[in-house]
Amino acid sequence: MELDLSPPHLSSSPEDLCPAPGTPPGTPRPPDTPLPEEVKRSQPLLIPTTGRKLREEERRATSLPSIPNPFPELCSPPSQSPILGGPSSARGLLPRDASRPHVVKVYSEDGACRSVEVAAGATARHVCEMLVQRAHALSDETWGLVECHPHLALERGLEDHESVVEVQAAWPVGGDSRFVFRKNFAKYELFKSSPHSLFPEKMVSSCLDAHTGISHEDLIQNFLNAGSFPEIQGFLQLRGSGRKLWKRFFCFLRRSGLYYSTKGTSKDPRHLQYVADVNESNVYVVTQGRKLYGMPTDFGFCVKPNKLRNGHKGLRIFCSEDEQSRTCWLAAFRLFKYGVQLYKNYQQAQSRHLHPSCLGSPPLRSASDNTLVAMDFSGHAGRVIENPREALSVALEEAQAWRKKTNHRLSLPMPASGTSLSAAIHRTQLWFHGRISREESQRLIGQQGLVDGLFLVRESQRNPQGFVLSLCHLQKVKHYLILPSEEEGRLYFSMDDGQTRFTDLLQLVEFHQLNRGILPCLLRHCCTRVAL
């Protein structure tokens, strides 16, 4: 009996594994169907996934717990994502809540810092009013916030209508940028000074045919009133991007932007090179131009695009020939960018200064102070002074009597160790800055605006008994030596070798606030520093 030990016949064709459409599963293959000759038993077979297996995997996935998405910002639409939103959302990685207060750090000139909670739409003027009240300072339109970038040696004064939170949000994270609270006498000087002093005739040119018959004064007045926009032109030294060499170009500031000519003073459009957009940039003063940028002069300024957050790349650094030229370019850039809004800020500042009651009563003044009245105790019984002029005259008489008592006390014989000078009344004045250097006094006056009449008094470093009056005139700081002299046991101070003598420095300053004397101008503004 012979047994058939050969392996059973197995079909490896695709038709055996995947039946034809319409054929129920499990139906045997017809026996008379021949095997395909091209299929070999040693070849691998492709087994397609059946629909039953896919349905089982779907049911298994739905039965598992859902895993939260750790990066929902990447799945949000670009308009709602702070990461995919583009430049408009580059102000911060997290959306800001307009209803929540924001913390702004403000520094004083002595380095002290104070944190202030402000609303999202708080302007620079609102923050200055808060700081003035906290510092117990006199409120006026000269206070301002200065945006400083020490790593770039750049700074600019914020306009009164600018949002402090928006400016701070544009700073690089972890940088050394800061706000500094100080006086800025040059903020509205363009509306107070004469047109010729701020905009020289050689730097103002009208590009419109309608202005050919207008005088220089009328053209400047229209410029200040934002009625027209003439060209500001002049030579500036420009450093190319990525280069350390400075080259002199003839530049033009127009409403459309800042340009420089590649061929002399030509205004042909073929020779004009576009530099920066006025509306999309801010202009800064360069504080350490020689050290950081290798400037040939100390009168540099920078045009920084708003989209630039960090680094030197993209900064357009300019260098002017003198301070008057730089002041003209800075003032024109502000007027071209803000236009009539700048003049509105000036009018609002003037109205607040003339009518302080519109701001409400200061919160630092207690209710009991409002009930105080002027009294006269010169007679046997006190009486209420109802006449305001009489009350003012009595206050002046009391102040003069107090000064006489102080002068009498200072004129008493004292040791020659300088104790009388250390107890002098001038040390309590805001314009007295003690023992600072000549360079430091020039820096302080330059920071608060190079306007005529800005002054301070300091101790002399060469003469231990003398003082120095530092005064700004024609955008230059001049220094006048004040020497003491003694006559009949009394001490006097003089700046003209004893021809005009004063009993103390306070009397000297008050005299030159009303009379020029040997000075080129009156003492108008005192350079002061307030601690926060």
From Swiss-Prot:
Effect of Y260F: Global loss of tyrosine phosphorylation. Abolishes interaction with FHL2 and HAX1
Domain Ras-associating, chain residue ranges per copy: 100-186
Phenotypic consequence of Y188F: Abolishes Ras activity increase and ERK1/2 phosphorylation
Gene Ontology BP annotations: epidermal growth factor receptor signaling pathway; negative regulation of translation; positive regulation of cell migration; stress granule assembly
Stretch list, region Disordered: 1-96
Chief place where the protein resides: cytoplasm
Keywords: Cell junction, Cell membrane, Cell projection, Cytoplasm, Lipid-binding, Membrane, Phosphoprotein, Repressor, RNA-binding, SH2 domain
Record's subcellular location: Cytoplasm; Cell junction, Focal adhesion; Cell membrane; Cytoplasmic granule
Annotated Pro residues bias: 21-34
Record domain PH: where: 229-338
Domain remark text: The PH domain mediates interaction with membranes containing phosphoinositides.
Record protein name field: Growth factor receptor-bound protein 7
Organism (species): Homo sapiens
